[in-house]
Regions:
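Short linear motifs at protein or domain termini
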Residues: 1-59, 65, 69, 192-195
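C-terminal flanking helix
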Residues: 11, 181, 185-188
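Conserved amphipathic alpha-helical segments that form helical-bundle/coiled-coil interaction surfaces
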Residues: 52-135, 153-159, 168-180
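Short coil/turn linker motifs that delimit alpha-helical repeat modules in TPR/alpha-solenoid proteins
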Residues: 93, 145-146
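Short helix-coil transition/hinge motifs at the ends and kinks of transmembrane helices
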Residues: 136-145
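Conserved mid-sequence domains
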Residues: 175, 187-190, 195
Length: 195
């Protein structure tokens, strides 16, 4: 229901706490803790996120394969820099981690040398940032994965592109996006069960 989805969005933002058998309670917070834009509430609809992840699978798997064929040393340097920033950010600097994550995906897009793919990715990049942010928050706070696992997934994509292995690039990208999808589905399932 719409109420459950709204409560799930508020929970993900850290604004409410759900206690099984007791109810939903507004948490005390400082203004600086409210780090998510209001648009995240729109994305907290399970179906919307599912659709966005499907779009990402379609666009980014092809982008990764194309990048493996068309990348140059400058592209690899930007991807490597994004990976290093991601590694340095760790769980302590969420904002840097998010920026590095997006930088990596946009570098893949540029490496494809396909302006239409790049434009499509740019069109969904704002929504991607929101789901990346949400996924990172869920991952880190639910202990369902670690920053190292997220880094390793990106590193595998990068290595496939370095090797110019189109099929491996496609497979590692789809694996990464499916892992994101599974974590978000599990989160939504748990959030609904607790209500």
């Amino acid at each position: 229901s719409a109420t459950r989805e709204a409560l799930s969005a508020l929970k993900a933002m850290g604004l409410v706490e759900m206690k099984q058998g007791e109810g939903t309670f507004v948490k005390q917070f400082e203004a600086e803790q409210l780090i998510f834009p209001l648009s995240i509430a729109i994305l907290m609809n399970k179906q919307d996120i599912s659709h966005l992840l499907e779009v990402r699978k379609i666009i980014e798997t092809g982008t990764a394969a194309s990048a493996a064929n068309n990348r140059n040393t400058e592209d690899l340097a930007i991807m490597a820099e994004a990976l290093e920033e991601m590694k340095q950010a760790g769980p302590s600097d969420e904002e840097l981690g998010e920026k590095a994550d997006l930088k990596f995906h946009l570098a893949l897009s540029a490496a494809s040398r396909n302006p239409i793919l790049s434009t499509l990715l740019d069109q969904v990049s704002e929504l991607m940032v929101e789901t990346m942010r949400e996924t990172r928050r869920i991952w880190f706070f639910s202990k369902q994965t670690t920053i190292e696992k997220l880094y390793q997934e990106h590193l595998q994509i990068y290595q496939a592109i370095v090797e110019k292995d189109e099929e491996k690039a496609r497979k590692t990208m789809i694996s990464h996006i499916e892992n994101v999808e599974n974590i978000l589905k599990k989160y939504f399932h748990e959030a609904i069960d607790k209500q």
